[in-house]
């Protein structure tokens, strides 16, 4: 019994679906929400998993991040570059996981999955192992049913995740990465760069349509 909260790496947990009861997307006003959420819904429907979208529009109003300020505000370059720190939405995972944990307990579900990965650690504090450990402990301590937060990809790369997805037969053309949220992947932002690298590392033909 699991609850799941789609990008390239997010697709993987729902294809290991023997326990998953619910998929959650959060619409928090990011540039790419409108591109990413339909893919999440599509994959859940294909696998017979209930999917819901929760509106967190207030984050766009009160939180500071280039991810919430339009495509032109998104920096280009690699995830490791300092300028990519502008894409951090403060405590985003903490907020979303807290909501998911509450929904899990309300439905007597025992686990909440998150698909953060090793490449996130450089700039996203709420993707790091110490954060995952802390919120897992908080979830267990703060719920009657001892909800646990499960983050199986915390210490592996996006390329390794892509390799697992390849074995599961996932079509990565049916996922979204680009932070700019245009009609096509821009090919230059941090997530696009890492997407290209991950697919190449896994030996997967990249059929993504890039602007450049």
Predicted regions and their residues:
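Short, intrinsically disordered, charge-biased short linear motifs at domain edges
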Residues: 1, 164-167, 172-181
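Glycine-rich nucleotide phosphate-binding loop and flanking beta-alpha elements
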Residues: 120, 199-200
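Local cysteine-cluster metal-coordination motifs and their immediate loop/turn environment
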Residues: 98, 174-197
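Acidic-residue sensor for enzyme active/binding pockets
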Residues: 2, 36, 194
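Short cysteine/histidine-rich metal-coordination sites, predominantly Zn2+-binding motifs
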Residues: 181-182, 202-212
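ATP-dependent adenylation/nucleotidyltransferase module used to activate substrates
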Residues: 6-169
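Short amphipathic alpha-helical interaction/hinge segments
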Residues: 143, 200-203
């Amino acid at each position: 019994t699991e609850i799941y909260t789609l990008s390239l790496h997010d697709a993987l947990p729902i294809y290991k679906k023997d326990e998953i009861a619910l998929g959650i997307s959060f619409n928090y006003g990011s540039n790419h929400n409108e591109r990413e959420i339909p893919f999440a819904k599509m994959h859940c429907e294909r696998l017979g998993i209930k999917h819901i979208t929760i509106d967190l529009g207030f984050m766009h109003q009160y939180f500071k991040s280039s991810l919430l300020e339009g495509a032109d505000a998104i920096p280009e370059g690699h995830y490791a570059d300092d300028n990519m720190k502008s894409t951090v939405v403060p405590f985003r995972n903490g907020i979303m996981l807290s909501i998911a944990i509450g929904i899990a307990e309300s439905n007597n579900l025992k686990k909440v999955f998150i698909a953060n990965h090793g490449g996130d650690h450089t700039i996203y504090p709420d993707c790091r192992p110490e954060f995952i450990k802390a919120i897992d402990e908080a979830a267990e301590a703060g719920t009657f049913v001892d909800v646990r937060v499960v983050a199986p990809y915390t210490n592996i790369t996006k390329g390794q995740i892509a390799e697992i997805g390849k074995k599961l037969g996932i079509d990565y053309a049916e996922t979204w990465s680009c932070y700019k949220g245009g009609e096509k992947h821009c090919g230059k932002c941090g997530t696009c760069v890492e997407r290209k690298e991950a697919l190449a590392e896994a030996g997967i033909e990249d059929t993504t349509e890039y602007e450049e």
